Amino acid sequence: MSASLVGSEMCIRDSRKYRKMCRQIIRDFDNLPMTDEKKPRVGVVGEILVKFLPAANNYIVDLLESEGAEAVVPDLTDFLLYCCYNQNFKADYLGATAKSKRINNMLIRFFEWLRKDARDELAKSKHFEPTAYIQDLAKQAEHIVSCGNQTGEGWFLTGEMLELIAQGATNIVCAQPFACLPNHIVGKGVIKEIRHEYPGANIVAIDYDPGASEVNQLNRIKLMLSTAQKNLKKTNS
């Protein structure tokens, strides 16, 4: 669970203590001893359950790390902000009330207030990057898919992939339940366009289902990782 959700109650009770805790956690992690080893960064995106539940994605983070990659899993809080931000499009084009738009924008500002100190400290750190604003994710995605694509992960999935590429995680696993129609549109459906805009993008869509072959999943992920390792060697040479 993200820091903004875990610490929300603490922040409301004692905001000074919460801000200090956020800064100290980031500084402690930033000062951990590190080696010079370079690993390919692999982002994990997709349907919300399959993305975050290890039992649903066959422990993909453990798999990536065991294969010598650095797994990058975007924040859960951003999905909540995506749900709130959708009210802007609904109010502007689909007949939702202006009141619902105002309330959801207030919720976004509240969550961003919770994350402000952590974001500021991440921006000053040596090894970490601050999370993107949901408004920026929407702007990144809207030239490929409309913000009216709100079924499931909708435009947010496209925005996450673009943000990962911007942060240097050009290798991406798009995890989805078998035959998940929304993901076929905003996940698989946009991969070709993303590759057109970013030729270095190395994206693979993996279907997860009790009847799906785990061997097939593993082979496709390893093929993606093989390409990632080759690209990393080219970059370092």
Residue ranges and their predicted role:
Residues 30-41, 163-169:
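Glycine-rich phosphate/diphosphate-binding loops that line cofactor/substrate pockets in enzymes
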Residues 43-47, 72-76, 174-175, 206:
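Generic beta-strand/beta-sheet core signal
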Residues 33-34, 45-53:
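Long, contiguous internal "core" modules enriched in hydrophobic/ aromatic residues
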Residues 1-7, 12:
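Single conserved hydrophobic/aromatic residue that forms the stacking wall/gate
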Residues 53-69, 134-234:
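Hydrophobic alpha/beta core scaffold segments
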Residues 237:
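Iron-sulfur (Fe-S) cluster-binding modules
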Residues 55-160, 167:
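Redox- and metal-dependent alpha/beta enzyme cores, enriched for Fe-S-associated oxidoreductases
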Residues 14-35, 154-158:
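Short N-terminal or domain-adjacent regulatory/targeting segments
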